[in-house]
Amino acid sequence: MTQDLHLLLTSNGFDNFQNCEVFNQNQANTLYNKGTESISRNLYGAIKVKKIEVISELFQLANKLATNGQTKIVFYPISTGNNWGYGTSLPNLSSGNSVILDLSLLNNIDMVNEYLGLVRIEPGVTQGQLSGYFEKNNLPFMVPVTGAGASCSILANALERGYGITPHQDHFAALTDLKAILPNGQHYQSPLSQLSSEAGQADLVNQTYKWNVGPYLDGLFTQSGLGVVYQATIRLKRIPAGFDSFYIDYKNDDDVRVAIEFIKSTLEKFEGIVGSINLMDRLRIISMLKPNPNKDTGNLLSSEQIETITKKEMVAAWTIVGSIYGEPSVVKQVKKLIKKAAKPHAHHIIFSGDVKIKIAKSVFGKMPAWFLPAIQDKLKSLAASIEIMRGRPNEIAKPLCYWRTTVPEQQSAIKDPAKDKCGLLWYAPLIPMSPDSVIRYTQHVRTVCRKHNIDPLITFTNLRHDLIDSTVPILFSQSSELSVSNAHSCLDELVKEGISLGYIPYRLNIEQQLRWFDGHLQSDQIMQKIYKAFDENGINQIGRYGK
């Protein structure tokens, strides 16, 4: 395509430039052609939307061009473009006609009903913005945080069916209502929303009942290319009166069996009181506490290095991290029961509300950095993890992205791993909740990762007593062709072999979507017919999860 985007829009009657900003090819590639994945794409342009109405106008124009046999453009919406490890701000395809539709300026927040805890947001609303909104307006709610940090979109994570560690851990489950624009220009709203509006009733009941009436269609807008969601209502969790977090260490690697049994039992007994529980292996904890000593060489951590760091930093083979929410008396009683259940097998059990932890924070907070640094590092990590569990976004997980990169880490408060050329891909399969499955899976990850010179860093996020999602960061150096090749080969083998073993990813990056949604899935075949009905000209998100 030789004609620049601005000229293409102008020559075809588009004139709403006061409500959007247009970037031509060079500008767009500079701003958006970046990522942690080392995936190559070529952009035709980008449009930063300031008003929702622009989306419909652009879809109308794109359909006109395609129908007349003129230049075809395909839009790829992003919320903030910080989908690190899955595609960042890149389109699924690189066909020369890809246009980024940047929705980051659509960032209105409307407290629909404080009494019920319902807030309406747009795609550009970040964890940090919502946190600031709550603080400014003295609203007693928790932000549905993720480890990605303050600069990431809340709505985008929900539409990717992501999750966090606060009580409303399933972020799409907490999304009660949405509005979208389809590629043919048609607007979508739920049946409850439309019926309430037509009856002249307050637009509220549809925002409290997720499942609507009749066929449930809202879910078709998640992990799909059906349309552009421009508004959604989410159910918030009020800050509880009581809170405590627990950290349980297991000394030996084979203690993972009793750790999983403890987690299943705890989530089953205390559903709604205990949030999701994370189980992390030794290497994952090391990556949070210390810089990579082999960053310059690109080598795996040796057994000797792991042993040295383990002793110096007091790192266990497995560490459980969880939280308790509720009335103070309830939290106190559940804490006793958790301690009793964990004690027979655990090496250490720590609760953030323990007096000794409070004293340690007070004492070490006044000490110089050189005084017992291992303890100080652990206390800092503890404090940051507590903030996350209380629904306050922070950057505790970001240093992980810099584990293999040789580019100096940003000193700014909010880091951008893509800008810093960090190498990160995610492997995120679902695992059956059973000790045997977890043990087999752990061996699978460690074997494949080491084969490709990748440090195997394993986290199990236990969302319910019957569900585990594992997240494994594939960390590499983008400045090394060999490191990039190893990372992609590693992820490909993890996914392919993992599926054969029953470990199916719940989320895929933009390359994997093309590979695994190749038309053979029955659900994919049904979605193609739906896409054909509403996007006959293929102007929106081609390649996204099989479209």
Residue ranges and their predicted role:
Residues 123, 128, 132-265, 269:
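FAD-binding subdomain of flavoenzyme oxidoreductases
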Residues 36-44, 65-74, 78-80, 85-98, ...:
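Conserved glycine-rich FAD pyrophosphate-binding loop
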Residues 90-126, 165-167, 236-237:
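Glycine-/small-residue-rich beta-strand-loop submotif within the FAD-binding core of flavoenzymes
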Residues 54-57, 129, 253-260, 328-337, ...:
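Short, conserved charged micro-motifs
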Residues 5-9, 58-62, 262-264, 322, ...:
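Short amphipathic alpha-helices in soluble, non-transmembrane regions
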Residues 50, 248-254, 321-330, 427-435, ...:
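Short beta-strand-to-loop capping motifs
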Residues 204, 218, 233-234, 244-255, ...:
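C-terminal cap/substrate-recognition region of VAO/PCMH-type FAD-linked oxidoreductases
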Residues 21-25, 48, 74-79, 101-103, ...:
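General beta-strand structural signal in soluble alpha/beta enzymes
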